[in-house]
């Protein structure tokens, strides 16, 4: 193989390797359905209160998921015992019904930016409780819900 081709391949491989997440956890959801009272709990520890981070929600479902979106209720829990609630609409399909995420086989993966460039104000253990906020209960075909914490990359995210 010519040296310049090898160099190009190595440069491409290295460029595609991103920084690993600070935390990545995925919770499995029963394929029998996700009931609204089923709360998925995520925890992580923060020591550096100056580092800017991005908080992302991962959703994996199969092709039979019957809706174009998924509403989730989020409860953030802080080390000092306080909490904050939020509601997020995750758009999973476009107007034509085509999934916006990527997938392999029957599964489709989506990643949603919940908070960008946040600085956690306190050292200690944080938590996030996730439950669905859809009208129908249970909702079918959701396989996993995940949470990722990554070093903030500036304005490079969509």
Regions found by a protein language model. Give the residues of each.
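Sec-dependent signal peptide recognition
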Residues: 2-9
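C-terminal motif of bacterial Sec signal peptides marking the signal peptidase cleavage site
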Residues: 13-16
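Bacterial signal peptide processing site
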Residues: 18-21
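Post-signal-peptide N-terminal segment of Sec-exported extracytoplasmic proteins
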Residues: 38-67
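Noncatalytic modules at the cell exterior or secretory-pathway interfaces
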Residues: 50-57, 118-134
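Short acidic/polar inter-strand loop motif in beta-rich domains
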Residues: 63-64, 109-119, 131-142
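Exposed low-complexity, polar/acidic, P/S/T/G-rich flexible segments that act as propeptides
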Residues: 72-77, 135-158
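An anionic, turn-rich surface loop/hairpin at beta-sheet edges
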Residues: 88-119
